[in-house]
């Protein structure tokens, strides 16, 4: 199974933050590390994670390298980014980019803690 892992799942995993999806986020990441799920991370999630972590830069680099060893970075084409900009069905542009990245890697699913904002997702 190919899955694009949304930023919030990865942040739950890294920070162990109190969230109702905390345990599920860990399970998803464990499945990726065991090779049971072919996990991807959207290219722009890396900068969001960097910005969100409240730790020294050395720690941020360590976490990003670990995540990139665990998940493959997925991009989006120029045309897909333009399509995301024009897509008025998504309220959040970043979520639309997640969906475009999932489409780019032919993901079977997009794993997120934010189900309500992905009702219009193609994946």
List where the protein language model places each region.
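Generic alpha-helical structural signal
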Residues: 23-26, 61, 65-68, 82
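Anionic, Ser/Thr-rich low-complexity intrinsically disordered regions
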Residues: 37, 41, 45, 62-65, ...
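A short, flexible beta-alpha/helix-coil linker loop
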Residues: 10-11, 46, 81
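Structured loop/turn residues at beta-strand edges in well-structured enzyme cores
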Residues: 5, 69, 105
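Residue-level signal for well-ordered alpha-helical positions
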Residues: 16-17, 52, 87, 121
């Amino acid at each position: 199974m190919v899955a694009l892992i949304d930023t919030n799942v990865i942040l739950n995993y890294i920070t162990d933050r109190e969230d109702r999806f905390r345990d599920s986020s860990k399970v998803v990441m464990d499945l990726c590390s065991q090779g049971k799920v072919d996990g991807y991370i959207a290219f722009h999630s890396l900068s969001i994670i960097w910005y969100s972590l409240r730790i020294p830069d050395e720690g941020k680099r360590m976490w990003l390298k670990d995540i990139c060893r665990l998940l493959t970075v997925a991009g989006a084409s120029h045309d897909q980014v333009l399509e995301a900009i024009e897509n008025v069905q998504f309220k959040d542009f970043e979520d639309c980019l997640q969906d475009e990245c999932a489409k780019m890697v032919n993901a079977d699913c997009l794993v997120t803690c934010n189900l309500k904002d992905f009702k219009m997702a193609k994946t």
